[in-house]
Amino acid sequence: MALYREGKAAMAADGTVTGTGTKWQSSLSLIRPGATIMFLSSPIQMAVVNKVVSDTEIKAITTSGAVVASTDYAILLSDSLTVDGLAQDVAETLRHYQSQETVIADAVEFFKSFDFDSLQNLANQIKADSESAESSAAAAAASESKAKTSEDNAKSSENAAKNSEVAAETTRDQIQQIIDNAGDQSTLVVLAQPDGFDSIGRVSSFAALRNLKPKKSGQHVLLTSYYDGWAAENKMPTGGGEFISSIGTATDDGGYIAAGPGYYWTRVVNNNSFTAEDFGCKTTATPPPNFNVLPAELFDNTAMMQAAFNLAISKSFKLNLSTGTYYFESSDTLRITGPIHIEGRPGTVFYHNPSNKANPKTDAFMNISGCSAGRISSINCFSNSYLGKGINFDRSVGDNRKLVLEHVYVDTFRWGFYVGEPECINQIEFHSCRAQSNYFQGIFIESFKEGQEYGHSAPVHFFNTICNGNGPTSFALGATYKTTKNEYIKVMDSVNDVGCQAYFQGLSNVQYIGGQLSGHGSPRNTSLATITQCNSFIIYGTDLEDINGFTTDGTAITADNIDAIESNYLKDISGAAIVVSSCPGFKIDSPHIFKIKTLSTIKLMNNTYNYEIGGFTPDEALKYNVWDANGLATNRISGVIHPRLVNSRLGINSVAFDNMSNKLDVSSLIHNETSQIVGLTPSTGSNVPHTRKMWSNGAMYSSTDLNNGFRLNYLSNHNEPLTPMHLYNEFSVSEFGGSVTESNALDEIKYIFIQTTYANSGDGRFIIQALDASGSVLSSNWYSPQSFNSTFPISGFVRFDVPTGAKKIRYGFVNSANYTGSLRSHFMSGFAYNKRFFLKIYAVYNDLGRYGQFEPPYSVAIDRFRVGDNTTQMPSIPASSATDVAGVNEVINSLLASLKANGFMSS
């Protein structure tokens, strides 16, 4: 009895049967009214086919009105057992194969010579002969005296009838056996194969297939599943399929070729696509709950997956991975040595136990080399012990070119994506990838070695790729590694940082677009990214956040030879924002800065020049900033700096310069009148005891360069808890624009410090007044630079105590005694909550006087004015009145009158 059971079927109460994946009207289905359909539900339901409406609909007769959900089923093709049904089935089969022009050597010849009319006539003749034989026998018995010839004839007729009946039964049995041998197919489709009836069969496992010896080449066999009984246990792909025999020898690869002595079977690969299960790989439904604990029984997929990789490379087939966890614990590394296409699913997990590797700390889980094209997508790679490299790229075979990694996650390794060999990568793209919670770097790419030119690396692009992680809480740096001061984007001549989330060295044309670089507050991260010795490096639109390094000053990006950093989102960073070293002509454009607790917004080091900064809007963010002046004492600027600020509210005073006060070219300091100067921070020297200080606009200018053609620039320090201080230069004010104001609304400022250096001649006066809210003077004093130290060998300090109730502090300097030196390091400072605050007066010459009054909110307007070469135009300041408040006020009023009389102030 033959069966039809392709697809699934459901039945409604009215007897309508709906199929899924069925072809009920196919010429080979042999389904006709009267056939019985059995639903393999619980309980089993049965109905009788009334009409075949379409390939997916049958009208059936049912007496119970049962409703059956979609399930497995079987249609009993019992009509084939009758002579009429058999003839009709065979006729339909022959018409189908004739229309398909299929050659069926033995079967077609048999059916061509088979005369069904003769078969029917023969059956009728058998019946007539049998009846005639019985009559003849009765007549013979009644009249034995009849002629012997009649008896012989009757006996011959009886024998002929029996022979004809046996022949008919034999023919019917042969054809029915053909139908039954079709098995699950429930049709005679298998007869379309050239080997016809004698080569159709099944084998239960790949191991059994190796032992199945074919009669000849070209035979077909169906493999039920890779492992015996696997198909019944697993609803996932089970490695079954169709194989074709060959007589000869071939290498058994465990999935595509099954070889025996003198023969082998080759898998039929449809649509150039196969699965890892075709090579015997196994998955579990979910990963273990704790990635530090391995399950008691672990199936190692390393050898089988490597064989699948090799086939995908050699035949250009696509390798499909299943949902679930593939375990790997072999000492071998998975290797990709050519173009490959691997496609996983959202739930595909590679779980790696590196403990069996020879060097578990450094050996790679997967190695890619010589991949000239390809795509790897949707794989989640995990290590159970923060060891080894997740995916390593090298050039042991050749350069990697135009490889796309998409939705590839590499987590909890020592390094995530790792490139440690020069010139091994070309045109690699990372799309929506992730390197998370890795022990050292999530992304480590080094294509440059000391003493070599740049490698031949072509563009490496990162699109919406996340690189972040917490790492083990017990992380500690080894003695062989070097840590650096954590800074936001740091560029250095030579650096060997660890703990950063991404490391790039010696690359050209790199783009990191979108995505995220984040440390998630891990105490082990020195920076989010280190970029060194790179050419044309762009970071655009990337979320940079949550860095909290070994100290309070985390580093977001450390960069060298960076080309552009654009439209980045900077959040919750503790440390310097951007540090640049040895990077001529780099570009920073339009990052989004949010709550970055930075030591300095931009820090320039080591031969950095001709840079451009544009589009910054850090107004809200900068109030969280803390500036640090320490820097790295060994680094010096060796090139002339030519910054260019383009429509940016972040200016040069947000830039920290390390030990380079003589290297700044002020002629191109500001190029845009709308630029804003924010937080200029110099490094400290050994003789400067205070770590946080501000430079005024005059800090970088000679007397002739003070205004420098710009109109309005700002300097801000949001060093909490102080209210913001702004230093700005207004070029075209109608009266003396020099007002220097420091708010003391909360009585926070307790002291004013004044400092001088050495090698000055002549004398001058610093004037300090403490004013109340109405402007009345509460206390005044002046100080001679010479009085700090008569020989000027070192710098010195004088303190002015701010009285209670002072709301404003007014500063000024008067050249009183032919002062011809430069006050290169004179500071005036507000001192609040033990946080020092410095304003530096710089490049004051004998023909220059300055006067300023502090007004809220910490705004300083410093305008240059010249009183001429005759110093007598400056009022003299008698020493006897140095501590006399009335005398000081008298001199100040005289100074103001002199300035107004000479046209330097309006009335």
Curated annotation (Swiss-Prot):
Residues 145-155 have a biased composition (Basic and acidic residues). GO terms for cellular component: virus tail, fiber. It comes from the Viruses. In the N-terminal section; belongs to the Webervirus depolymerase family. Residues 137-169 are annotated as: Disordered. Homotrimer. This is Depolymerase, capsule K2-specific. It is found in: Virion. The keyword Transmembrane does not apply. Keywords: Degradation of host capsule during virus entry, Degradation of host cell envelope components during virus entry, Host-virus interaction, Viral attachment to host adhesion receptor, Viral attachment to host cell, Viral tail fiber protein, Viral tail protein, Virion, Virus entry into host cell. The N-terminus contains an extended triple helical bundle. The central part is a beta-helical domain, which forms a negatively charged cavity at the interface between neighboring monomers. This cavity may contain the active site. The C-terminus is formed by 3 four-stranded beta-sandwich folds. Constitutes the tail fiber, which functions as a receptor binding protein (RBP) and mediates the attachment to the host capsular exopolysaccharides. Displays a depolymerase activity that specifically degrades the K2-type polysaccharides of Klebsiella pneumoniae, which allows the phage to reach the host cell membrane and bind the entry receptor. GO terms for biological process: adhesion receptor-mediated virion attachment to host cell; symbiont entry into host cell via disruption of host cell envelope; symbiont entry into host cell via disruption of host cell glycocalyx.
